[in-house]
Design a protein with these regions (language model features):
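SAM/dcSAM-binding transferase cores
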Residues: 190-241
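Mobile active-site "lid"/loop adjacent to the S-adenosyl-L-methionine
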Residues: 112-139
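General small-molecule cofactor/ligand-binding pocket signal
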Residues: 13, 90-92, 178-181
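Residue-level signal for inorganic ion chemistry
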Residues: 28, 111, 140, 198
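A generic structural signal for alpha->beta connector loops
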Residues: 9, 60-62, 86-88, 151, ...
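Conserved Class I SAM-dependent methyltransferase catalytic core
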Residues: 17, 21, 135-187, 191
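Conserved SAM/SAH cofactor-binding pocket of Class I
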Residues: 30-102, 107-110, 116-121
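SAM-dependent Rossmann-like transferase core, predominantly class I methyltransferases
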Residues: 2-39, 45-47, 52-57, 209-219
Length: 241
């Protein structure tokens, strides 16, 4: 049984979820920098860790997590109820392709729990979480465009190899990428992930010439310790910092 993952303001119980909390997810949540979002949707919420991190970082926001895996949703609900943010965090069992929000959404965060072109896992719950053959980056971006209000904010965590693909998908659906944060484990390893921040444009005010700012994030130094950059980023969440 997986142990609970304790943070400074909340604890994530994860014994029933398809995929446990990872350091990459924590880094992504800590990197999230919504400017104006007050209604945030966490797509593929899993344990609820990103939803809870968003509630901690943005005290005026309401956060809803959505996931297709019922045991994960049930456990995320418990995590939300037991957190200081119970009045602002909720979790829904639904397919994001069918979901229709009750209130307009102006912020979406998503750590897509799938890897295109990877073989399915032999374990069914991990297969469900990590391999959705009919759910591509293009369909995800299209769905986010439909759900978000104009000028809404989108945050995605993706494999670094997906950069060209996601930039093309964002352009197709009238998003302007603002920043791309490359995430590498150590200074000598190439980035394995990117965190993409984009804004949904009005159809009448869309330009493909918007400059994209690139930021580099390195988690560990050569001696295996957290970098000062990582320590500063995660000190509001990790107990040991």
């Amino acid at each position: 049984m997986r142990k609970p993952f304790a943070m400074k303001q909340f604890t994530v119980v994860q014994s029933e979820v398809a995929l446990p909390v990872t350091s990459d997810a924590c880094v992504f949540g800590a990197l999230a920098d919504f400017q104006n979002a007050t209604q945030i949707l966490d797509i593929g919420s899993g344990t609820g860790v990103l939803s809870l991190m968003m509630a901690q970082k943005f005290p005026s926001a309401r956060v809803q997590g959505i996931d297709i895996h019922l045991p994960s949703v049930e456990q995320a609900r418990e995590n939300g109820i037991n957190s200081p943010f119970a009045d602002r965090v909720s979790f829904l069992h639904d397919n994001i392709l069918d979901f229709e929000p009750d209130t307009p959404i102006n912020g979406i965060i998503c750590n897509p729990p799938f890897f295109e072109n990877h073989l399915p896992s032999s374990d069914e719950t991990r297969r469900l979480a990590r391999h959705a053959q009919s759910f591509t980056l293009l369909s995800l971006t299209a769905r986010c465009a439909r759900l978000l209000k104009t000028h809404g904010e989108l945050l995605l965590l993706l494999p670094a190899s997906s950069q060209n693909q996601i930039l093309a998908a964002l352009q197709q659906h009238q998003f302007s990428p603002q920043t791309i944060t490359t995430i590498q484990a150590t200074p000598t390893k190439p980035p394995h992930l990117i965190a993409v921040y984009a804004i949904k444009n009005s159809p009448h005010h869309f330009s493909t010439d918007t400059p994209t700012h690139t930021i580099q994030y390195t988690h560990y130094s050569a001696d295996g310790q957290l970098t000062p950059q990582a320590t500063e980023l995660l000190k509001g969440f990790y107990l040991a910092l």
